[in-house]
Amino acid sequence: MKQNHNQTISPELKEKLARIRHLALDMDGTIYMGSTLFPFTIDFLAEMRAAGIGYSFLTNNPSRSVADYLKKLEGLGIEADEENMYTTSLAAIDYIKAHYPSARRLFLLGTPSMVSQFEKAGFESCADDPDDVPDVLVAAFDMTLDYQRLCRASWWASQGVPYIATNPDRVCPTDQRTVLVDCGSICRCIEHATGRRPDITLGKPDPNMLKGILDRHG
């Protein structure tokens, strides 16, 4: 029998929920950990739908494209579409379009999945070539990171190319027995080599992350 979720919400909570139109829900470490869905997630989302509250999934992890995240959510039993997703890749794309409108070619220190998200948005990815000068350098959580590309990113940072970090996290949450070195730690490496920090670091808690959701659902 299908549960009537409205009956599980107290009157006091209903009153508070009535003032909420849309929620921004973190993903990594909040609705799931690695590949493990938390036991309360499905029921919580059902309660929000029953209360007429919309929600978006947001994540500081740019290593997957929106399509990849939707596939992961589907595998965990969560229904979602592109309108429900906002990643730090999308935040970086929105930021570049707003602040560097003429930028077309980017040096992207990120996974192939992330690069595909930028290419889908109309950008081109620069080669690892000192003559292929980027309009903007983007450093991200790159699980495919290799030494040559780290050196090239450091070179462009040292040359004054506009420099954006997708998120501040030092490590990415995981249920595996390892430490996933994240964007913040990669940027510290570049800083140690060049003395330069990113011009802006997006992702939570930067307000640009919520601005993207407000622009879509506000």
Please name every model-derived segment.
Residues 1-27, 31-218:
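HAD-like aspartate-dependent phosphatase fold
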